[in-house]
């Protein structure tokens, strides 16, 4: 942006698109209630804004993500970005997809950029040590023993990996991905998640009075309000 003598903008979608579509799929196409707690969010809006601000970004736009907005075409969205913000360059991840039915993938947007000549597309390459596999329907579990659980695939042979993947209907994801981080946190593998995040994972919230269970389980606990 500085080289182009322009300004930088980050666009955030809130709530998370996956949360909105996941709720709609389970509730006959209904929108999630305003303010509904997103238990799968890795960071709050405030945390993201602090991180973005630390990078020196000029402006951040928070778009309320709704099913009505999701039904817009990627051409409409990009048209708004060009027409109202004067967008000259768009930076996306390699697996990004915009617009209704995720039709605006990198290839489609690249073709549009070349055809119009209005903006250029910069694609950020994937980072991290390749791919891993996570269960398709992984759910959080309480570790059975003290300490953090080990990687179930560590030291496994190819045959053992295939058997594990088949048993858990595992899907391939990037090691450095939010999907993998959620899986690791849900399994209690906090250190592995922290290694990907580059910092300790934290949950922010207001501490409230609870049932004082920490007195009975041998270690202190803190109760957070639902407004996390």
Q: Where on the chain are the PLM-derived regions?
A:
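Short beta-strand/loop segments at the ligand-binding rim of alpha/beta enzyme cores
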Residues: 4-12, 118
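Active-site cores that bind ATP or allylic diphosphates and position pyrophosphate for catalysis
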Residues: 75, 79-228
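Short, glycine-rich nucleotide/cofactor-binding loops
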Residues: 1
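A structural preference for short, hydrophobic beta-strand core positions in alpha/beta folds
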Residues: 10, 62, 123-124
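N-terminal Rossmann-like or analogous alpha/beta NTP/dinucleotide-binding catalytic cores
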Residues: 15-120, 135
């Amino acid at each position: 942006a500085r080289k182009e003598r322009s300004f930088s903008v980050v666009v955030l979608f809130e709530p998370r698109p996956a949360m909105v579509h996941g709720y709609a799929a389970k509730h006959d196409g209904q929108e999630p209630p305003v303010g509904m707690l997103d238990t799968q969010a890795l960071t709050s809006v405030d945390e993201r804004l602090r991180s973005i601000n630390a990078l020196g970004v000029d402006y951040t736009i928070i778009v309320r993500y709704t099913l009505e907005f999701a039904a817009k075409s990627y051409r409409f969205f990009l048209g708004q970005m060009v027409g109202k913000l004067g967008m000259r360059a768009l930076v996306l991840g390699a697996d990004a997809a915009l617009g209704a039915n995720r039709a605006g993938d990198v290839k489609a947007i690249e073709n549009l950029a070349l055809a119009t000549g209005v903006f250029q597309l910069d694609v950020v390459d994937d980072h991290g040590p390749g791919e891993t596999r996570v269960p398709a329907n992984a759910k959080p579990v309480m570790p059975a023993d003290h300490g953090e659980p080990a990687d179930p695939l560590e030291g496994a042979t190819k045959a053992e990996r295939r058997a594990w993947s088949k048993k858990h209907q595992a899907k391939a994801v990037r090691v450095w991905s939010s999907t993998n981080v959620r899986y690791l946190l849900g399994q209690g593998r906090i250190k592995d998640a922290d290694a990907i995040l580059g910092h300790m994972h934290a949950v922010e919230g207001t501490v409230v009075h609870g049932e004082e269970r920490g007195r009975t389980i041998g270690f202190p606990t803190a109760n957070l309000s639902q407004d996390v």
